[in-house]
A protein has these predicted regions:
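Small/aliphatic-rich secondary-structure junction motif
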Residues: 3-55, 84-87, 134
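Short secondary-structure boundary segments
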Residues: 37, 114-116, 143
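Generic structural signal for helix capping and beta-alpha/helix-loop junctions
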Residues: 42-43, 96-98, 120
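Short, hinge-like loop/turn segments at secondary-structure boundaries
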Residues: 50-54, 105-107, 129-130
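A short acidic, glycine-rich active-site loop
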Residues: 54-70
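Structural beta-alpha unit
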Residues: 77-111
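Glycine-rich, Arg-bearing micro-motifs that act as flexible, cationic patches
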Residues: 110-134
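Short, flexible loop segments at boundaries between secondary-structure elements
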Residues: 137-143
């Protein structure tokens, strides 16, 4: 049923729970696990810093990419150690649009996303809700 499972992964506790669930799902199905991490734009104050020192923005972005690549490598190792075939991709853009584009491009059969347990007040504006509104594949929300 599910041949390609994609998990949205970042530095959050919720993403760690989503990764664990995605690994558990992928293993018995022998599904390919794709770990996607979105590289979002830097905060606006970097634009001001760029006026004074243009390399500052590029250096900060590269440091962010490097940190996220290291995070992904750790996730791939964790999946591989569990016997799951896994790859990782970094995508640029907004959180929602990046996840949706990656799921379409990689032909994901299932998308797994973590969601805070105590995040009910703004649930209608959550990343999970917005991704659900824009993706064509089934979505599993992990608390």
């Amino acid at each position: 049923m599910f041949h390609t499972i994609m998990v949205a992964y970042d530095e959050s506790r919720e993403a760690a729970h989503a990764l664990a669930s995605a690994i558990e799902l992928a293993k018995p199905l022998r599904a390919h696990l794709i770990i996607v991490t979105v590289v979002e734009a830097l905060p606006a104050f970097y634009n001001i810093a760029a006026i004074v020192s243009p390399p500052v923005v590029e250096e900060a972005l590269e440091e962010k990419r490097s940190r996220l690549r290291t995070l992904q490598q750790s996730a791939v190792k964790r999946a591989t150690a569990a016997g799951v075939n896994a790859d990782a991709i970094l995508v640029d853009g907004g959180e929602v649009s990046g996840i949706v584009r990656a799921a379409q491009r990689e032909h994901a059969d299932l998308l797994v996303i973590g969601h805070p347990k105590h995040y009910r007040l703004g649930a209608f504006n959550s990343t999970v809700r917005n991704v659900a509104d824009h993706t064509r594949c089934p979505l599993l929300e992990v608390n």
